[in-house]
Amino acid sequence: MLCCSASVKFSNGLQLSLLICACLLAVLIVSFCRRR
């Protein structure tokens, strides 16, 4: 979740959205791998 808190520092809405999407994807991948 560090990437999510770090992305808040960016003022650009587009960059913020992309970083949030990337962070969410990373969390989903990690949770999916842990299930296996």
From Swiss-Prot:
Keywords: Host membrane, Membrane, Transmembrane, Transmembrane helix. It is found in: Host membrane. It is a single-pass membrane protein. One of its GO terms (cellular component) is membrane. The chain crosses the membrane at residues 13-33. This is Protein P4. It comes from Grapevine leafroll-associated virus 3 (isolate United States/NY1). The lineage of its organism: Viruses, Riboviria, Orthornavirae, Kitrinoviricota, Alsuviricetes.
